[in-house]
Amino acid sequence: MWKVIIRRILLMIPQLFILSILVFFFAKLMPGDPFSGLIGPHTDPHEVEALRRAAGLYDPWWEQYLRWLGNAIHGNLGMSYNLKEPVMTVIGHRAINTFWMSLLSVILTYLFAIPMSIVAARNEGKWQDQLWLTYNSITFGIPPYVFYLLIIFIFGYSLNWFPTGGTVSPDAMGIIPVFFSKIYHMILPAFSLAVFGTVGIFTYFRSGILDEQTQDYVRTARAKGVKEKVIFRRHILRNASLPIASNFGFVITGLLGGAIFAETIFGYPGLGQLFITSISGRDYSMITALILLNGFLGLLGALLSDIIMAMVDPRIRIQ
C-alpha cells in the first residue's frame, strides 16, 4: 500500500507544476492588474506606474512566473489589496470556518445517504424505493442557490430558528457556549450542502447493492443456507461500499466548491464567500491563491480516494 501512496504523491508534483502555470496565466488574462483598483480621479498615474514597476509587472513573463512560484513555495502568496493583510493570513482564518462546516456537512451527507441507499435497495420497486428515487431526482434538478434561498427564507427569516449570518453569537462567552454557537451557526449551510451531497452517494451505493445482490457468490451463499442478514451485512454491503469509498475524497473537494454559493447566501465567512468578494473587488492575489488552493485540494482528494481504495480493496495493493 505504501508503494501506491508514494507513487501517487510523486505524480502530484508535475500536476501541481502544471496547475501553477495555468493559475498564473489565468491571472494574467484577467482585465487590469492588482493596482488598477488604486486608480481614481485624484490619483497620480505616475505613482501607480511606479508601483507596477516595483512589483515587476513589466518583467518578462517567465521571470514573473518564477518569482511568483518561488514565493508560493515559501508560503508567500502576496498581499490582499482589499483587506491590506497577507493572503495566507486571511486564508488561514477563513479556512478554519470552511473546514468545520465541510466536516459537519460530510458527516450529515453519509448519515443521510447510506440509510437511504440501503432502504431503497432492500425494497427495490416498492414505495420506499420510489420515495427516495423521487427525492433524488428532485434534488438533482433543483439549482443549489434556489434551494439555499428557500431554506434561509423558511428557517432563518420566517421561523427564525437559525441565524442568517456569521459564525458565532455576540453574546456567547466561554469555550463551551462559543463551541455550541459555532455549530448552531453552521447547521443551515452544512445541512444544505449535505442535501445535494447525498445525490451522488445514494446513486452509487444503491446501484452497488443491487449489482452485488445478483453476483454468483451471493447465490452460492444462499444455496449453502447462510442467513440473508449475514450475506447482506458481511458481503453485499462491504463490496458495494467500494465505489463510495473511492468517491470520499471527491465528496470533500466537491463540498468545498459548493461552499462558494452556500457561504455567500448564508453569510458564512469562509473560503467560498472570500472568493466571491475577491472577484467583485478584483483582488488578484487572493483570487489566484484561492484557485491554486482549490486545485491542490482537488489533487489531494484524488490522492485520498486512492489511499482509501488501497486500504479497503486488496486488489489495488497487489497491483
UniProtKB/Swiss-Prot annotation:
One of its GO terms (biological process) is peptide transport. Keywords: Cell membrane, Membrane, Peptide transport, Protein transport, Transmembrane, Transmembrane helix, Transport. It is found in: Cell membrane. InterPro entries: BPD_transp_1_N, MetI-like, MetI-like_sf. It is a multi-pass membrane protein. The keyword S-adenosyl-L-methionine does not apply. PROSITE patterns: ABC_TM1. It comes from the Bacteria. Residues 95-305 form the ABC transmembrane type-1 domain. Pfam families: BPD_transp_1, BPD_transp_1_N. Its main location: membrane. The chain crosses the membrane at residues 9-29, 99-119, 137-157, 183-203, 248-268, 289-309. GO terms for cellular component: plasma membrane. The keyword Transmembrane helix applies. Part of the ABC transporter complex OppABCDF involved in the uptake of oligopeptides. Probably responsible for the translocation of the substrate across the membrane. Essential for uptake of peptides larger than three amino acids and for growth in milk. Belongs to the binding-protein-dependent transport system permease family. OppBC subfamily. The complex is composed of two ATP-binding proteins (OppD and OppF), two transmembrane proteins (OppB and OppC) and a solute-binding protein (OppA). This is Oligopeptide transport system permease protein OppB. It comes from Lactococcus lactis subsp. lactis (strain IL1403) (Streptococcus lactis).
